Amino acid sequence: MSQHDPVSAAWRAHRAYLVDLAFRMVGDIGVAEDMVQEAFSRLLRAPVGDIDDERGWLIVVTSRLCLDHIKSASTRRERPQDIAAWHDGDASVSSVDPADRVTLDDEVRLALLIMLERLGPAERVVFVLHEIFGLPYQQIATTIGSQASTCRQLAHRARRKINESRIAASVEPAQHRVVTRAFIEACSNGDLDTLLEVLDPGVAGEIDARKGVVVVGADRVGPTILRHWSHPATVLVAQPVCGQPAVLAFVNRALAGVLALSIEAGKITKIHVLVQPSTLDPLRAELGGG
């Protein structure tokens, strides 16, 4: 058990982050979970003491598994469902600055996934790792077994394709990403202290699935959130919806709820949980969540 205990700790520390990363790449919660589980299986088999940066190692393995999956799906011409049907009409062209970067708006639309489908496998992985998760090209090069210069070229091509596709693609502000990920990791680990750090003291939330009932105050909202959404069968991933930071909650790989977050000055000020079937059914059909 001496080797299993550190892996269990790694699972608690990194699983939520890795599932979020994998979901951004493959667009299917079931596949994302499988990729992360396989990465941890390989960590369990890795020689003790050979890994200096545990999260970095897991990012590399998970990303390579996702890349292999995307390549395999492309070969079989199996592409995820077109989720743009659920959220259409907001297409716009991002302007490009002199460095030829996509000028990304203030939020991520669900259309991000369908936009990524227009990229080749390597382009997709590089774009997600660099533009969304902020990893440097040198680290990405290690991940995909290439050179940093090649990764820059892949990113350049990806940004060109995104602009040419005329699909609205935007990345939520960096602060929103940090807060949302901290929220997810706290919930995934049942860590009330960390959750309270990202909640505004006066946070208000409709979070108990009873319409019109609002809970106010971090000391009440935090425990209620954990009671409903911190379970072994629950997987949370960041996926802004309709222009608002949000978290998708999957239970046994089926979409069970959408937690819409209002974030101000680095704190969550409002949480609205959507669990009505009429709201979730269209998303379930499009996100591969059952």
UniProtKB/Swiss-Prot annotation:
Sigma-70 factor domain-4_2: annotated span: 110-162
Pfam families recorded: Sigma70_r2, Sigma70_r4_2
Record motif Polymerase core binding, residues: 34-37
Keyword Transcription included in the entry's annotation: yes
Induction: Constitutively expressed at a low level under all conditions tested. Transcribed under control of SigJ.
Family: Belongs to the sigma-70 factor family. ECF subfamily.
NCBIfam families registered for this protein in UniProt: PRK09635.1, sigma70-ECF
Quaternary state and interactors: Interacts transiently with the RNA polymerase catalytic core formed by RpoA, RpoB, RpoC and RpoZ (2 alpha, 1 beta, 1 beta' and 1 omega subunit) to form the RNA polymerase holoenzyme that can initiate transcription.
Name of the protein this chain belongs to: Probable ECF RNA polymerase sigma factor SigI
Species of the source: Mycobacterium tuberculosis (strain ATCC 25618 / H37Rv)
Gene: sigI
